[in-house]
Amino acid sequence: MTNIRKNHPLLKIVNQSFIDLPTPTSISAWWNFGSLLGICLAMQILTGLFLAMHYTSDTMTAFSSVTHICRDVNYGWLIRYLHANGASLFFMCLYLHIGRGLYYGSYTFLETWNIGIILLFTVMATAFMGYVLPWGQMSFWGATVITNLLSAIPYIGTDLVEWIWGGFSVDKATLTRFFAFHFILPFIITALVVVHLLFLHETGSNNPTGISSNMDTIPFHPYYTIKDILGLILMILLLMTLVLFYPDLLGDPDNYTPANPLNTPPHIKPEWYFLFAYAILRSIPNKLGGVLALVCSILVLAIIPLLHTAKQRSLMFRPISQCLFWLLAANLMILTWIGGQPVEHPFIIIGQVASISYFTIILVLMPIAGLIENKLMKW
Protein backbone atom coordinates (compact mmCIF):
# COMPACT_ATOMS: atom_id res chain seq x y z
CA MET A 1 0.00 0.00 0.00
CA THR A 2 2.85 2.36 0.90
CA ASN A 3 4.46 1.73 -2.46
CA ILE A 4 1.24 2.49 -4.39
CA ARG A 5 0.82 5.69 -2.37
CA LYS A 6 4.35 6.81 -3.15
CA ASN A 7 4.74 5.55 -6.72
CA HIS A 8 1.33 5.88 -8.41
CA PRO A 9 1.38 9.04 -10.62
CA LEU A 10 -1.89 10.44 -9.20
CA LEU A 11 -1.72 9.12 -5.64
CA LYS A 12 1.86 10.40 -5.40
CA ILE A 13 0.59 13.99 -5.78
CA VAL A 14 -2.10 13.43 -3.12
CA ASN A 15 0.49 11.80 -0.86
CA GLN A 16 2.93 14.71 -1.18
CA SER A 17 0.14 17.25 -0.58
CA PHE A 18 -1.90 15.73 2.27
CA ILE A 19 -0.18 12.67 3.78
CA ASP A 20 3.63 12.83 3.82
CA LEU A 21 3.70 16.64 3.56
CA PRO A 22 6.44 17.95 5.91
CA THR A 23 4.64 20.33 8.30
CA PRO A 24 6.18 22.55 11.01
CA THR A 25 5.69 21.14 14.51
CA SER A 26 4.83 24.54 16.00
CA ILE A 27 1.79 25.57 13.92
CA SER A 28 -1.27 26.42 16.01
CA ALA A 29 -5.02 26.10 15.49
CA TRP A 30 -4.86 29.26 13.32
CA TRP A 31 -3.47 27.03 10.57
CA ASN A 32 -6.70 25.00 10.62
CA PHE A 33 -8.69 27.44 8.50
CA GLY A 34 -7.13 26.38 5.18
CA SER A 35 -8.57 22.88 5.47
CA LEU A 36 -11.88 24.28 6.81
CA LEU A 37 -12.11 26.52 3.73
CA GLY A 38 -11.56 23.48 1.51
CA ILE A 39 -14.38 21.63 3.29
CA CYS A 40 -16.64 24.73 3.06
CA LEU A 41 -15.98 24.94 -0.69
CA ALA A 42 -16.78 21.24 -1.19
CA MET A 43 -19.99 21.62 0.84
CA GLN A 44 -21.05 24.73 -1.09
CA ILE A 45 -20.50 22.99 -4.45
CA LEU A 46 -22.43 19.91 -3.30
CA THR A 47 -25.41 21.77 -1.78
CA GLY A 48 -25.38 24.21 -4.70
CA LEU A 49 -25.57 21.34 -7.18
CA PHE A 50 -28.70 19.96 -5.50
CA LEU A 51 -30.26 23.43 -5.34
CA ALA A 52 -29.53 23.99 -9.05
CA MET A 53 -31.52 20.82 -9.85
CA HIS A 54 -34.70 22.51 -8.58
CA TYR A 55 -34.00 26.22 -9.13
CA THR A 56 -35.23 28.13 -12.21
CA SER A 57 -33.37 31.27 -13.29
CA ASP A 58 -36.40 33.16 -14.55
CA THR A 59 -37.73 36.37 -12.99
CA MET A 60 -41.28 34.97 -12.96
CA THR A 61 -40.44 31.69 -11.21
CA ALA A 62 -37.10 32.19 -9.34
CA PHE A 63 -38.70 33.24 -6.03
CA SER A 64 -41.34 30.49 -6.29
CA SER A 65 -38.70 27.86 -7.09
CA VAL A 66 -36.77 28.72 -3.90
CA THR A 67 -40.05 28.47 -1.93
CA HIS A 68 -40.72 25.13 -3.67
CA ILE A 69 -37.25 23.87 -2.64
CA CYS A 70 -37.96 24.77 1.00
CA ARG A 71 -41.48 23.32 1.10
CA ASP A 72 -41.74 20.42 -1.35
CA VAL A 73 -38.26 19.02 -2.00
CA ASN A 74 -37.06 16.30 0.40
CA TYR A 75 -34.84 18.10 2.94
CA GLY A 76 -34.81 21.06 0.53
CA TRP A 77 -35.02 23.47 3.49
CA LEU A 78 -31.90 21.84 4.95
CA ILE A 79 -29.96 22.06 1.68
CA ARG A 80 -31.00 25.68 1.13
CA TYR A 81 -30.05 26.82 4.65
CA LEU A 82 -26.81 24.80 4.61
CA HIS A 83 -25.91 26.64 1.41
CA ALA A 84 -26.89 30.10 2.70
CA ASN A 85 -25.30 29.74 6.15
CA GLY A 86 -22.39 27.76 4.68
CA ALA A 87 -21.51 30.93 2.74
CA SER A 88 -21.42 32.89 6.02
CA LEU A 89 -19.13 30.30 7.58
CA PHE A 90 -16.99 30.32 4.43
CA PHE A 91 -16.40 34.06 4.89
CA MET A 92 -15.79 33.70 8.64
CA CYS A 93 -13.04 31.16 7.91
CA LEU A 94 -11.77 33.28 5.00
CA TYR A 95 -11.37 36.44 7.10
CA LEU A 96 -9.73 34.51 9.96
CA HIS A 97 -7.40 32.84 7.41
CA ILE A 98 -6.39 36.26 6.01
CA GLY A 99 -6.00 37.64 9.55
CA ARG A 100 -3.69 34.74 10.39
CA GLY A 101 -1.65 35.51 7.25
CA LEU A 102 -1.33 39.17 8.26
CA TYR A 103 -0.45 38.41 11.89
CA TYR A 104 2.22 35.81 11.22
CA GLY A 105 3.69 37.43 8.09
CA SER A 106 2.59 34.70 5.68
CA TYR A 107 2.26 37.42 3.01
CA THR A 108 6.00 37.12 2.35
CA PHE A 109 5.10 34.03 0.28
CA LEU A 110 4.25 36.38 -2.59
CA GLU A 111 2.77 33.92 -5.11
CA THR A 112 0.60 32.18 -2.50
CA TRP A 113 -0.56 35.53 -1.11
CA ASN A 114 -1.42 37.02 -4.52
CA ILE A 115 -3.34 33.92 -5.62
CA GLY A 116 -5.15 34.21 -2.28
CA ILE A 117 -6.19 37.80 -3.11
CA ILE A 118 -7.49 36.67 -6.53
CA LEU A 119 -9.38 33.90 -4.70
CA LEU A 120 -10.90 36.46 -2.31
CA PHE A 121 -12.18 38.59 -5.21
CA THR A 122 -13.57 35.51 -6.97
CA VAL A 123 -15.33 34.23 -3.83
CA MET A 124 -16.81 37.69 -3.22
CA ALA A 125 -18.11 37.85 -6.80
CA THR A 126 -19.61 34.36 -6.45
CA ALA A 127 -21.31 35.21 -3.14
CA PHE A 128 -22.71 38.46 -4.53
CA MET A 129 -24.21 36.69 -7.56
CA GLY A 130 -25.60 33.93 -5.34
CA TYR A 131 -27.37 36.53 -3.20
CA VAL A 132 -29.21 37.80 -6.31
CA LEU A 133 -30.63 34.38 -7.26
CA PRO A 134 -33.56 34.03 -4.77
CA TRP A 135 -34.99 37.17 -6.44
CA GLY A 136 -36.28 38.76 -3.25
CA GLN A 137 -36.37 42.51 -2.64
CA MET A 138 -32.81 42.70 -1.28
CA SER A 139 -31.56 40.44 -4.10
CA PHE A 140 -32.99 42.73 -6.77
CA TRP A 141 -32.03 46.04 -5.19
CA GLY A 142 -28.61 44.77 -4.09
CA ALA A 143 -27.93 43.72 -7.69
CA THR A 144 -29.16 47.08 -8.99
CA VAL A 145 -27.08 49.17 -6.57
CA ILE A 146 -23.83 47.18 -6.76
CA THR A 147 -23.79 46.72 -10.56
CA ASN A 148 -24.68 50.41 -10.94
CA LEU A 149 -21.39 51.29 -9.24
CA LEU A 150 -19.63 50.38 -12.49
CA SER A 151 -21.32 53.36 -14.14
CA ALA A 152 -18.84 55.51 -12.16
CA ILE A 153 -16.08 54.35 -14.54
CA PRO A 154 -15.47 57.30 -16.88
CA TYR A 155 -16.53 57.06 -20.55
CA ILE A 156 -17.41 53.33 -20.70
CA GLY A 157 -19.32 53.09 -17.38
CA THR A 158 -22.92 53.27 -18.62
CA ASP A 159 -22.28 50.92 -21.56
CA LEU A 160 -20.55 48.47 -19.22
CA VAL A 161 -23.48 48.41 -16.78
CA GLU A 162 -26.04 47.84 -19.57
CA TRP A 163 -23.81 45.12 -21.02
CA ILE A 164 -23.70 43.34 -17.63
CA TRP A 165 -27.47 43.79 -17.16
CA GLY A 166 -28.24 42.54 -20.67
CA GLY A 167 -30.75 45.38 -21.00
CA PHE A 168 -31.65 48.73 -19.49
CA SER A 169 -32.36 47.39 -16.00
CA VAL A 170 -31.78 44.31 -13.83
CA ASP A 171 -34.13 41.77 -15.42
CA LYS A 172 -34.42 38.20 -16.75
CA ALA A 173 -31.16 38.41 -18.74
CA THR A 174 -29.28 39.56 -15.62
CA LEU A 175 -30.68 36.76 -13.47
CA THR A 176 -29.91 34.08 -16.08
CA ARG A 177 -26.28 35.15 -16.55
CA PHE A 178 -25.77 35.56 -12.79
CA PHE A 179 -26.98 31.98 -12.30
CA ALA A 180 -24.61 30.75 -15.04
CA PHE A 181 -21.66 32.58 -13.47
CA HIS A 182 -22.63 31.52 -9.95
CA PHE A 183 -22.60 27.90 -11.12
CA ILE A 184 -19.25 28.02 -12.96
CA LEU A 185 -17.21 30.22 -10.59
CA PRO A 186 -16.86 27.67 -7.73
CA PHE A 187 -15.08 25.33 -10.16
CA ILE A 188 -12.74 28.17 -11.17
CA ILE A 189 -12.20 28.78 -7.43
CA THR A 190 -11.33 25.08 -7.00
CA ALA A 191 -8.71 25.38 -9.78
CA LEU A 192 -7.27 28.50 -8.12
CA VAL A 193 -7.17 26.66 -4.76
CA VAL A 194 -5.02 23.95 -6.39
CA VAL A 195 -2.63 26.67 -7.66
CA HIS A 196 -2.69 28.30 -4.19
CA LEU A 197 -1.64 24.96 -2.62
CA LEU A 198 0.93 24.33 -5.35
CA PHE A 199 2.72 27.59 -4.54
CA LEU A 200 2.37 26.99 -0.79
CA HIS A 201 3.99 23.56 -1.06
CA GLU A 202 6.89 25.08 -3.02
CA THR A 203 7.93 26.99 0.11
CA GLY A 204 6.31 24.94 2.88
CA SER A 205 4.05 26.34 5.59
CA ASN A 206 4.91 29.35 7.71
CA ASN A 207 4.77 28.97 11.52
CA PRO A 208 3.98 31.27 14.48
CA THR A 209 7.62 32.26 15.02
CA GLY A 210 8.12 33.28 11.39
CA ILE A 211 11.47 31.43 11.40
CA SER A 212 12.31 28.68 8.89
CA SER A 213 11.19 25.31 10.25
CA ASN A 214 12.83 23.06 7.64
CA MET A 215 14.80 21.24 10.33
CA ASP A 216 11.75 20.58 12.51
CA THR A 217 8.86 19.07 10.54
CA ILE A 218 6.47 16.14 10.97
CA PRO A 219 4.19 14.38 8.44
CA PHE A 220 0.81 16.04 7.91
CA HIS A 221 -0.98 12.71 8.43
CA PRO A 222 -1.85 11.57 11.13
CA TYR A 223 -0.79 14.55 13.29
CA TYR A 224 -2.55 17.43 11.56
CA THR A 225 -5.40 15.44 10.01
CA ILE A 226 -6.50 14.61 13.57
CA LYS A 227 -5.93 18.21 14.69
CA ASP A 228 -7.98 19.52 11.72
CA ILE A 229 -10.87 17.16 12.53
CA LEU A 230 -11.35 19.03 15.84
CA GLY A 231 -11.78 22.31 13.94
CA LEU A 232 -14.12 20.57 11.51
CA ILE A 233 -16.32 19.26 14.34
CA LEU A 234 -16.54 22.74 15.89
CA MET A 235 -17.39 24.27 12.51
CA ILE A 236 -20.11 21.68 11.83
CA LEU A 237 -21.49 22.32 15.33
CA LEU A 238 -21.69 26.07 14.65
CA LEU A 239 -23.17 25.52 11.17
CA MET A 240 -25.83 23.08 12.37
CA THR A 241 -26.75 25.40 15.27
CA LEU A 242 -27.28 28.18 12.73
CA VAL A 243 -29.14 26.00 10.22
CA LEU A 244 -31.42 24.18 12.67
CA PHE A 245 -32.10 26.88 15.27
CA TYR A 246 -31.44 30.29 13.68
CA PRO A 247 -31.52 29.77 9.88
CA ASP A 248 -32.41 33.41 9.11
CA LEU A 249 -30.20 35.06 11.73
CA LEU A 250 -27.65 36.30 9.16
CA GLY A 251 -30.13 36.89 6.32
CA ASP A 252 -32.34 39.88 5.55
CA PRO A 253 -36.11 39.74 6.16
CA ASP A 254 -36.63 41.86 3.00
CA ASN A 255 -35.55 38.87 0.93
CA TYR A 256 -38.77 37.06 1.87
CA THR A 257 -40.65 39.63 -0.22
CA PRO A 258 -40.59 38.94 -4.00
CA ALA A 259 -38.55 41.46 -6.04
CA ASN A 260 -40.52 44.56 -6.94
CA PRO A 261 -38.81 47.19 -9.15
CA LEU A 262 -41.46 49.77 -8.13
CA ASN A 263 -40.81 49.54 -4.38
CA THR A 264 -37.39 50.40 -2.95
CA PRO A 265 -36.58 48.92 0.51
CA PRO A 266 -35.80 51.57 3.19
CA HIS A 267 -32.25 50.27 3.75
CA ILE A 268 -30.45 48.51 0.91
CA LYS A 269 -27.53 46.53 2.30
CA PRO A 270 -25.52 43.45 1.26
CA GLU A 271 -24.86 40.33 3.34
CA TRP A 272 -22.96 40.86 6.62
CA TYR A 273 -19.62 39.73 5.13
CA PHE A 274 -19.59 42.66 2.67
CA LEU A 275 -20.71 45.33 5.14
CA PHE A 276 -17.18 46.55 5.99
CA ALA A 277 -16.46 47.28 2.30
CA TYR A 278 -19.97 48.75 1.86
CA ALA A 279 -19.33 51.12 4.80
CA ILE A 280 -16.08 52.30 3.15
CA LEU A 281 -17.96 52.80 -0.15
CA ARG A 282 -20.68 54.88 1.56
CA SER A 283 -18.26 56.98 3.61
CA ILE A 284 -17.12 58.88 0.49
CA PRO A 285 -19.77 61.27 -0.89
CA ASN A 286 -18.39 60.95 -4.44
CA LYS A 287 -19.49 57.95 -6.56
CA LEU A 288 -16.17 57.26 -8.34
CA GLY A 289 -14.21 57.94 -5.13
CA GLY A 290 -16.41 55.48 -3.25
CA VAL A 291 -15.94 52.77 -5.88
CA LEU A 292 -12.15 53.27 -5.83
CA ALA A 293 -12.12 53.10 -2.01
CA LEU A 294 -14.24 49.92 -2.15
CA VAL A 295 -11.80 48.20 -4.54
CA CYS A 296 -8.77 49.50 -2.63
CA SER A 297 -10.13 48.18 0.67
CA ILE A 298 -9.45 44.66 -0.65
CA LEU A 299 -6.63 45.48 -3.10
CA VAL A 300 -4.62 47.06 -0.27
CA LEU A 301 -3.77 43.47 0.76
CA ALA A 302 -1.61 43.20 -2.39
CA ILE A 303 0.80 45.95 -1.28
CA ILE A 304 1.16 44.74 2.32
CA PRO A 305 4.30 42.67 1.44
CA LEU A 306 5.91 45.88 0.09
CA LEU A 307 5.15 47.71 3.34
CA HIS A 308 6.85 45.10 5.54
CA THR A 309 9.62 47.15 7.18
CA ALA A 310 10.33 44.95 10.23
CA LYS A 311 13.30 42.61 10.42
CA GLN A 312 11.07 39.99 12.05
CA ARG A 313 8.46 38.24 9.97
CA SER A 314 5.78 37.41 12.52
CA LEU A 315 4.02 39.76 14.98
CA MET A 316 4.57 37.17 17.72
CA PHE A 317 7.41 39.17 19.34
CA ARG A 318 6.34 42.67 18.19
CA PRO A 319 4.01 44.25 20.80
CA ILE A 320 3.51 47.62 19.05
CA SER A 321 2.46 45.97 15.78
CA GLN A 322 0.27 43.55 17.75
CA CYS A 323 -1.66 46.49 19.23
CA LEU A 324 -2.12 47.95 15.74
CA PHE A 325 -3.27 44.59 14.37
CA TRP A 326 -6.00 44.24 16.99
CA LEU A 327 -6.92 47.89 16.48
CA LEU A 328 -7.41 47.02 12.79
CA ALA A 329 -9.56 44.00 13.73
CA ALA A 330 -11.75 46.18 15.99
CA ASN A 331 -11.91 48.82 13.24
CA LEU A 332 -13.22 46.22 10.77
CA MET A 333 -15.92 45.21 13.25
CA ILE A 334 -16.95 48.88 13.60
CA LEU A 335 -17.09 49.18 9.79
CA THR A 336 -19.23 46.02 9.61
CA TRP A 337 -21.64 47.51 12.16
CA ILE A 338 -21.76 50.88 10.35
CA GLY A 339 -22.43 49.17 6.99
CA GLY A 340 -25.71 47.85 8.37
CA GLN A 341 -26.86 51.22 9.76
CA PRO A 342 -28.88 53.90 7.90
CA VAL A 343 -27.02 56.85 6.34
CA GLU A 344 -27.64 59.45 9.05
CA HIS A 345 -25.85 61.21 11.90
CA PRO A 346 -23.84 59.92 13.86
CA PHE A 347 -23.26 56.84 11.66
CA ILE A 348 -21.90 58.87 8.71
CA ILE A 349 -19.03 60.42 10.68
CA ILE A 350 -18.25 57.14 12.52
CA GLY A 351 -18.02 55.39 9.12
CA GLN A 352 -15.73 58.10 7.72
CA VAL A 353 -13.39 58.01 10.74
CA ALA A 354 -13.31 54.17 10.65
CA SER A 355 -12.61 54.18 6.88
CA ILE A 356 -9.72 56.65 7.22
CA SER A 357 -8.26 54.74 10.18
CA TYR A 358 -8.53 51.44 8.24
CA PHE A 359 -6.23 52.72 5.49
CA THR A 360 -4.03 54.69 7.93
CA ILE A 361 -3.30 51.65 10.11
CA ILE A 362 -2.36 49.48 7.10
CA LEU A 363 -0.50 52.03 4.95
CA VAL A 364 1.12 54.31 7.55
CA LEU A 365 1.13 53.04 11.13
CA MET A 366 2.11 49.38 10.53
CA PRO A 367 5.28 50.23 8.50
CA ILE A 368 6.27 52.91 11.07
CA ALA A 369 5.72 50.42 13.93
CA GLY A 370 8.01 47.95 12.11
CA LEU A 371 10.80 50.55 11.92
CA ILE A 372 10.36 51.53 15.59
CA GLU A 373 10.60 47.87 16.63
CA ASN A 374 13.80 47.49 14.60
CA LYS A 375 15.25 50.46 16.52
CA LEU A 376 14.15 49.01 19.87
CA MET A 377 15.91 45.74 18.99
CA LYS A 378 18.99 47.80 17.95
CA TRP A 379 18.86 46.25 14.45
Curated annotation (Swiss-Prot):
<dbReference type="Pfam" id="PF00033">
    <property type="entry name" value="Cytochrome_B"/>
</dbReference>
<feature type="binding site">
    <location>
        <position position="201"/>
    </location>
    <ligand>
        <name>a ubiquinone</name>
    </ligand>
</feature>
<keyword id="KW-0349">Heme</keyword>
<dbReference type="InterPro" id="IPR005798">
    <property type="entry name" value="Cyt_b/b6_C"/>
</dbReference>
<feature type="transmembrane region" description="Helical">
    <location>
        <begin position="77"/>
        <end position="98"/>
    </location>
</feature>
<feature type="transmembrane region" description="Helical">
    <location>
        <begin position="113"/>
        <end position="133"/>
    </location>
</feature>
<feature type="binding site" description="axial binding residue">
    <location>
        <position position="182"/>
    </location>
    <ligand>
        <name>heme b b562</name>
    </ligand>
</feature>
<feature type="binding site" description="axial binding residue">
    <location>
        <position position="196"/>
    </location>
    <ligand>
        <name>heme b b566</name>
    </ligand>
</feature>
<feature type="transmembrane region" description="Helical">
    <location>
        <begin position="347"/>
        <end position="367"/>
    </location>
</feature>
<dbReference type="InterPro" id="IPR048260">
    <property type="entry name" value="Cytochrome_b_C_euk/bac"/>
</dbReference>
<protein>
    <recommendedName>
        <fullName>Cytochrome b</fullName>
    </recommendedName>
</protein>
<keyword id="KW-0999">Mitochondrion inner membrane</keyword>
<keyword id="KW-0472">Membrane</keyword>
<dbReference type="GO" id="GO:0045275">
    <property type="term" value="C:respiratory chain complex III"/>
</dbReference>
<feature type="binding site" description="axial binding residue">
    <location>
        <position position="83"/>
    </location>
    <ligand>
        <name>heme b b562</name>
    </ligand>
</feature>
<dbReference type="GO" id="GO:0005743">
    <property type="term" value="C:mitochondrial inner membrane"/>
</dbReference>
<keyword id="KW-0479">Metal-binding</keyword>
<dbReference type="InterPro" id="IPR048259">
    <property type="entry name" value="Cytochrome_b_N_euk/bac"/>
</dbReference>
<dbReference type="Pfam" id="PF00032">
    <property type="entry name" value="Cytochrom_B_C"/>
</dbReference>
<feature type="transmembrane region" description="Helical">
    <location>
        <begin position="226"/>
        <end position="246"/>
    </location>
</feature>
<dbReference type="GO" id="GO:0046872">
    <property type="term" value="F:metal ion binding"/>
</dbReference>
<feature type="binding site" description="axial binding residue">
    <location>
        <position position="97"/>
    </location>
    <ligand>
        <name>heme b b566</name>
    </ligand>
</feature>
<keyword id="KW-0830">Ubiquinone</keyword>
<keyword id="KW-0812">Transmembrane</keyword>
<keyword id="KW-0496">Mitochondrion</keyword>
<dbReference type="InterPro" id="IPR027387">
    <property type="entry name" value="Cytb/b6-like_sf"/>
</dbReference>
<keyword id="KW-0249">Electron transport</keyword>
<feature type="transmembrane region" description="Helical">
    <location>
        <begin position="288"/>
        <end position="308"/>
    </location>
</feature>
<comment type="similarity">
    <text>Belongs to the cytochrome b family.</text>
</comment>
<dbReference type="InterPro" id="IPR005797">
    <property type="entry name" value="Cyt_b/b6_N"/>
</dbReference>
<feature type="transmembrane region" description="Helical">
    <location>
        <begin position="33"/>
        <end position="53"/>
    </location>
</feature>
<feature type="transmembrane region" description="Helical">
    <location>
        <begin position="178"/>
        <end position="198"/>
    </location>
</feature>
<comment type="function">
    <text>Component of the ubiquinol-cytochrome c reductase complex (complex III or cytochrome b-c1 complex) that is part of the mitochondrial respiratory chain. The b-c1 complex mediates electron transfer from ubiquinol to cytochrome c. Contributes to the generation of a proton gradient across the mitochondrial membrane that is then used for ATP synthesis.</text>
</comment>
<feature type="transmembrane region" description="Helical">
    <location>
        <begin position="320"/>
        <end position="340"/>
    </location>
</feature>
<dbReference type="InterPro" id="IPR036150">
    <property type="entry name" value="Cyt_b/b6_C_sf"/>
</dbReference>
<keyword id="KW-0679">Respiratory chain</keyword>
<dbReference type="InterPro" id="IPR016174">
    <property type="entry name" value="Di-haem_cyt_TM"/>
</dbReference>
<keyword id="KW-1133">Transmembrane helix</keyword>
<dbReference type="InterPro" id="IPR030689">
    <property type="entry name" value="Cytochrome_b"/>
</dbReference>
<dbReference type="GO" id="GO:0008121">
    <property type="term" value="F:ubiquinol-cytochrome-c reductase activity"/>
</dbReference>
<comment type="subunit">
    <text>The cytochrome bc1 complex contains 11 subunits: 3 respiratory subunits (MT-CYB, CYC1 and UQCRFS1), 2 core proteins (UQCRC1 and UQCRC2) and 6 low-molecular weight proteins (UQCRH/QCR6, UQCRB/QCR7, UQCRQ/QCR8, UQCR10/QCR9, UQCR11/QCR10 and a cleavage product of UQCRFS1). This cytochrome bc1 complex then forms a dimer.</text>
</comment>
<keyword id="KW-0813">Transport</keyword>
